[in-house]
From Swiss-Prot:
The active site is at D52 (nucleophile). It comes from the Bacteria. Substrate binds at Y110. Formation of pseudouridine at positions 38, 39 and 40 in the anticodon stem and loop of transfer RNAs. GO terms for biological process: tRNA pseudouridine synthesis. Homodimer. Coiled coil: none annotated. PANTHER family: PSEUDOURIDYLATE SYNTHASE, TRNA PSEUDOURIDINE SYNTHASE-LIKE 1. HAMAP family: TruA. It catalyses: uridine(38/39/40) in tRNA = pseudouridine(38/39/40) in tRNA. Keywords: Isomerase, tRNA processing. It is an enzyme of class 5 (isomerase). This is tRNA pseudouridine synthase A.
Length: 268
């Protein structure tokens, strides 16, 4: 029995999230069906992050166990020949039995993209939120976000339906910057609550539009005022960038941040 790790990229626009579910097309189901076709075995996959419907991934990490003669590094090419073009396997490697795509991760990285231009852009429409009504103040947004760093209870930023025992998690870093008309919100954390990033971004946009102050934003999550959370950012602007481990298991690729920066003029 071998454990195989996959570095996976997908456009989540037409998928009901990562996790397999009844009467819906998901990334996990699509990947497992492709694995069945090539191995003739029922394969259970595990991911570093369970992305919601419409959310993308530029460097999702997945693993599965298999008893098969196929070389580990061949799965990427074979799977890419079977999978829809919206799902790509960037690399496949064999890992230790003790390594787990989810539990071995030190932290995960999500990025949210806001198009703050007055004009729509079809070339980034499926991967950004076109919020154009007011020019966002990214400095205010950044100032409001910094107090979230560290371990806190983020109950206010958790959608109903979560199966977690508690809403405590540790945010490693929040970075918000403007690149011309685009606002990039990068959040790194040990774990994320259900709908957490989209709820955070929704409230930060209100801060950037000066509809609420940074102090009100902080009061909402510190005092768990869930009913005061008024807006959730659309799924299409959110991307699971990567998961970070003590040791990089992928041999060919040293940095699995594959976010398409070539679309962003002046990005560095």
């Amino acid at each position: 029995m071998k454990r195989i790790a996959l570095l996976v990229q997908y456009d989540g626009s037409n998928y009901s999230g990562w996790q397999r579910q009844k009467n819906a097309t998901t990334v996990q189901e699509t990947l497992e069906r492709a694995l069945f076709k090539i191995t003739h075995q029922v394969v259970k996959t595990f991911a570093a992050g369970r992305t919601d419907a419409g959310v993308h991934a530029s460097g999702q990490v997945v693993h599965f166990n298999i008893d098969c003669v196929i070389p580990a590094n061949s799965y990427s090419d074979i799977l890419n020949g079977l999978l829809p073009s919206a799902i790509r396997i960037l690399e496949s490697v064999e890992v230790k039995d003790s390594w787990h795509s989810c539990y071995s991760a030190m932290y995960r990285h999500y990025r949210y993209v806001i198009n703050n231009s007055k004009f729509p852009n079809l070339f980034i429409n499926n991967w950004s939120w076109h919020r154009y009504q007011k020019i966002l103040d990214e400095v205010l947004m950044s100032n409001a976000s910094k107090l979230m760093e560290g371990e806190h209870d983020f109950f206010a930023f958790q959608k109903s339906g979560s199966q977690r025992k508690n809403s405590i998690t540790k945010i490693k870093n929040v970075e918000i910057k403007r690149v011309e008309d685009l606002i990039l919100v990068d959040i790194k954390a040990t774990g994320f609550l259900y709908g957490m990033v989209r709820l955070i971004v929704g409230q930060l946009v209100l801060v950037g539009e000066k509809k609420i102050s940074p102090e009100i934003f902080t009061d909402i999550w510190v005092n768990q005022k869930k009913n005061d959370v008024k807006e959730s950012a659309p799924a299409k602007g959110l991307c699971f960038v990567n998961a970070v481990y003590e040791e990089n298991v992928f041999k060919k690729i040293n940095n699995n941040d594959f976010f398409p920066v070539f679309l962003i003029k002046g990005f560095s």
